[in-house]
Amino acid sequence: MSLHREPTATEVKEQKIYREMGLTDEEFALVESILGRLPNYTETGLFSVMWSEHCSYKNSKVLLKKFPIDGDKVLQGPGEGAGIIDIGDEQAVVFKIESHNHPSAIEPYQGAATGVGGILRDVFSMGARPISLLNSLRFGELTSPKVRYLFEEVVAGIAGYGNCVGVPTVGGEVQFDPCYEGNPLVNAMCVGLIDHKDIQKGQAKGVGNTVMYVGASTGRDGIHGATFASEELSEASEEKRPAVQVGDPFMEKLLLEACLELIKSDALVGIQDMGAAGLTSSSAEMASKAGSGIEMNLDHVPQREKGMTPYEMMLSESQERMLIVVKKGREQEIKDIVAHWGLHAVEVGQVTDDKKLRLLHKGEVVADVPVDALAEDAPVYHKPSKVPAYYEAFQSEKTQWIPTIANVKDTLLSLLQQPTIASKEWVYEQYDYMVQTNTVVSPGSDAAVVRIRGTKKALAMTTDCNSRYLFLDPEVGGKIAIAEAARNIVCSGGVPLGVTDCLNYGNPEKPEIFWQLEKSTDGMSEACRELGTPVIGGNVSLYNETNGVAVYPTPVIGMVGLIEDVGHITTQAFKKAGDLIYVIGEAKAEFGGSELQKLVNGEISGKAPAIDLAVEKKRQEQLLEAIRAGAVASAHDIAEGGLAVALAESMMGEAVGADVVIDGEWTTELFAESQSRFLVSVPKEKQAIFESLVEDAIHLGQVTDHPQLNIQDVNGAQVLQASVNEMLEAWKGAIPCLLKSKA
């Protein structure tokens, strides 16, 4: 039930109740100054959620301005529900990634499920039909019973929601490191398709127009969810379980179809999802973006619980709700469309010209605040920054760690069993990735590929981030995150179009954490400019700490690419015996942050692998040209585990093998994680074309019809011999085996 008596404005100030809501003393004084009076309890709540990091990006906005956001094909950059990029033929791709980390740590099934629901609404509120979902997940070590529980429940929540709503979950990534034990990361991405003429904006335009509420009723779930997402997790966080929202994917499906029908009506003026901060953010942001105001009568808000206060209604984050603005006098048209889908559209207010959010309840004005103060004019901070001692120590090391390998085969099999490298089939077999029947490349390759019906085109999509590199060197790691995502798009035959990012970090009030955020956004910005991939939207999730210990800096990159002709679609699997195997790029003795270092030492240290963005760009462009020329049978990014793992992954499940000759020190050639490298196979008859197009390609060997990996050195000495079955057993069995463990 709600509070019996809300504190008075004076009590809010004197008892410093605003601190419990997340406002600092200085911020409360600023609210008082803006209003020219003390805010009441409800108004304090409005400011506390809108000025939370989750809604305002107050600690990160200064850094986000560094990102390139413009491009020839960008139709909508940051600022709306999702970004939009033109793909020709009057069509565009809409995509966005968001986090649901804190809710997933407390209530993993619903936290993950509602993360999927929220990102779907961001995309279809733009007028786009969602065509795919992806995710990026981080957990602690699977040897921990708590981690196994979180992992299983998060995957079940993603599957449960996505499968029911009828949108395929086609790809993503899952990584495991001890730093995520108490604070898993659950980032969900949605990709949608739209015709230019259907693009919508979340704006409340037209004085006198009607504000309507569509979708599920409002309950008490998720109250202060945005504030909860803007603080560190602790032992007490378990008590905040009621702050986690509960999703209904069947309601979402009805809402999706209703909204896509609504956008065909010229009676619709604006539409926005009620996401973080619920009615507060949707109303304040829609009015602020349009330079207008909104007056709402909360008596008309559909409520599923008795006795809800204005504070509770405005801060609820109940799921499957939309706020829309409709031309005055045409409300019935909207109601009829929505009713066709079994939903209600309720008139809750109107657009005004005074730039205020005015709330009425039981005949009284319960809040009257400037919309710009809530939205655009939230305070912005540039926190102090300090280089961490660990970074200085790593950088000053005179020599870098180089492993000594006693048995190459055992090392490869052990790497294939590492959960970060091992097959994620246990995860994606729970997802319906074929619903809508447009999925061309399923989970498990470098990028997922979804065709665009009625055209020869397809979209490649991926999520990527190696947070170990970012921990060792945030700036270099930021560059690598962008480059690896682009590499995966290119390996699928696509040209990278743009980026949506999810910046997952610790507490920015700690100078060392803010330094990580600052440096990694520097690296990301530079890579985006060099590779021509504008950032069209994203999300910031800070305070990812448990009892004062932060996660690694984890800026997850969501990237979409355009494949002009489905004939160019390429996968990582070797295709047929006789094809020639090439590696593009050279291996260097770079093991800092590598899977091998983690396997051997149990921890990471040293320097991240170096990256030259000009070389990266050249190799990507040349490989894409070779793919389009029909000279490439398979392509795979060389990433975690190095060349040896890439070779193994290229023959998993295929009735082929490989004979390879390496020239150089075995450990470096096979296991170093040097950047800007690709493993490709080339039809023998296309060898001349391939070699004329790709400069840095080194011929390693060829694909065989014997399912075995044979590696020799240039002197003919046997380096490794492993059957595909042995590798497959290690790779596929690792995660299911750990989940069955009772340790």
Curated annotation (Swiss-Prot):
Description of how the protein assembles with itself and partners: Monomer. Part of the FGAM synthase complex composed of 1 PurL, 1 PurQ and 2 PurS subunits.
Binding positions for Mg(2+) 1 per the UniProt entry: E98, N539
GO cellular component, one term: cytoplasm
InterPro entries: PRibForGlyAmidine_synth_PurL, PurL_linker, PurM-like_C_dom, PurM-like_C_sf, PurM-like_N, PurM-like_N_sf
BP-aspect Gene Ontology terms: 'de novo' IMP biosynthetic process
Protein name per UniProt: Phosphoribosylformylglycinamidine synthase subunit PurL
Pathway(s) served: Purine metabolism; IMP biosynthesis via de novo pathway; 5-amino-1-(5-phospho-D-ribosyl)imidazole from N(2)-formyl-N(1)-(5-phospho-D-ribosyl)glycinamide: step 1/2
HAMAP family: PurL_2
Functional description taken from the UniProt entry: Part of the phosphoribosylformylglycinamidine synthase complex involved in the purines biosynthetic pathway. Catalyzes the ATP-dependent conversion of formylglycinamide ribonucleotide (FGAR) and glutamine to yield formylglycinamidine ribonucleotide (FGAM) and glutamate. The FGAM synthase complex is composed of three subunits. PurQ produces an ammonia molecule by converting glutamine to glutamate. PurL transfers the ammonia molecule to FGAR to form FGAM in an ATP-dependent manner.
Highest taxon of source: Bacteria
Residues at which Mg(2+) 2 binds: D122, D273
Enzyme class: ligase
Subcellular location: Cytoplasm
Family: Belongs to the FGAMS family.
Signal peptide range: none
